[in-house]
Amino acid sequence: MSHLESMVLCREAQVSTLQSLFGERHHFSFPSIFIYGHTASGKTYVTQTLLKTLELPHAFVNCVECFTSRLLLEQILNKLSHLNSSDAGCSTEMTCETFNDFVQLFKQVTSAEHLKDQTVYIVLDKAEYLRDMEANLLPGLLRLQELTDRNVTVIFLSEIIWEKFRPNTGCFEPFVLYFPDYSIGNLQKILSHDHPPEYSADFYAAYINILLGVFYTVCRDLKELRHLAVLNFPKYCEPVVKGEAGERDTRKLWRNIEPHLKKAMQTVYLREISSSQWEKLQKDNTDPGQLKGLSAYTHMELPYYSKFILIAAYLASYNPARTDKRFFLKHHGKIKKTNFLKKHEKTSNHLLGPKPFPLDRLLAILYSIVDSRVAPTANIFSQITSLVTLQLLTIVGHEDQLNGPKYKCTVSLDFIRAIARMVNFDIIKYLYDFL
């Protein structure tokens, strides 16, 4: 256990819970476990490390790689069949057309002597992609232990909550385990663990402390922070290498690295340039804004529905109001663009600038573009207020007017396209100027 804790830092409670769920090798474990948490919260790493360290038979499948249920089921079967084969290259690839075929083939694979008397684990990473496959797949995997009468546990790893998975018809409920975000103390401990051997642990820990002081408010992603730590460490060491400062001259080292980290917030975090381009920038002492190919917008972390509110506001600002029926109603009939054109509308709406729109139109568009129904709660209205505070929306006229406030969207086309990409929304299809 101590060896496992040294490999998996700051996840002792989750490791302990999983070990208690797994139990002894020959005991029947929980049929299905649903593990969720934000990106880079350690879900995949902890699960894989635990299964490998305990040497438990398992098949790990990334659902992103399997765009059909057939590919997914075949990959599970083939990985399990390789566990039986002494030489993985000699085993034949298995095929199955339906979930019923999968159940029968799974029984055959797990009847081998090596797998018969112990729990077999199937780990499905990026499990949210299962929702786009056949309706019977998720309920079937949740009840796989019952359907096959085998000692099997299916582990789902996802970034979204279980309530977004649960079918309307009902299903077997898995054991739900939450991986919270790493605290700043956790990140300090994990990142300090990666210190280069040529420098002392205290020196690298001081650097990580500075790095988190700058980036923690805008980025909690462990992978991003680890990337930033590796990328910016040579600049932090520069005064020490040149003999201008010692390892304990924290103030001098901070003054040297501070402008460098501020530039890093504007470029590398957005992945608008590669690491090699970033290093070249620092050698040439070039302003990041001068690099060809960079966009002008700045990065913001917005809540999920705030992104859709901003998209709806942009559509309301740049589309004529009477085109809403065309874009957001399913049965609008065939309408040609030329039927809408008047003399003053032949100019692009993007050249004329954003038009004001009422709140009810914004909400109507929002409900049309969001997949799941969004109730008009105080949370939605507070997010609109936040967007106004961030100056992404502006209020037109007086706030106390009787017929309700009107708004304008102030963001650029490049900015809104970047926001739309984050939520997989093709905004160009809904813009009147691009018909």
Swiss-Prot record:
Localization recorded for this chain is: Nucleus; Chromosome
Cite the binding residues for ATP.
37-44
Q: Name one GO molecular function term.
A: ATP binding
Q: Which GO terms describe its cellular component?
A: chromatin; cytosol; nuclear origin of replication recognition complex; nucleoplasm
Modification after translation (UniProt): Multi-mono-ubiquitinated by OBI1; ubiquitination is important for efficient DNA replication origin site activation. Ubiquitination levels are low in mitotic and early G1-phAse cells and are induced in late G1-/early S-phase, peaking in S-phase and decrease toward the end of the cell cycle.
Entry keyword ATP-binding: yes
Q: Which InterPro entries match?
A: AAA_16 (IPR041664), ORC5 (IPR020796), ORC5_C (IPR047088), ORC5_lid (IPR048866), P-loop_NTPase (IPR027417)
Predominant location category: nucleus
Keywords annotated in UniProt: ATP-binding, Chromosome, DNA replication, Nucleotide-binding, Nucleus, Ubl conjugation
Tree of life domain: Eukaryota
Q: Which segment of the chain is annotated as a signal peptide?
A: none
Q: Name one GO biological process term.
A: DNA replication
> What job does this protein perform?
Component of the origin recognition complex (ORC) that binds origins of replication. DNA-binding is ATP-dependent. The specific DNA sequences that define origins of replication have not been identified yet. ORC is required to assemble the pre-replication complex necessary to initiate DNA replication.
Subunit record text: Component of ORC, a complex composed of at least 6 subunits: ORC1, ORC2, ORC3, ORC4, ORC5 and ORC6. ORC is regulated in a cell-cycle dependent manner. It is sequentially assembled at the exit from anaphase of mitosis and disassembled as cells enter S phase.
Q: Which family does it belong to?
A: Belongs to the ORC5 family.
The protein's name: Origin recognition complex subunit 5
Highest classification ranks of the organism: Eukaryota, Metazoa, Chordata, Craniata, Vertebrata
What is the name of the gene encoding this protein? Orc5
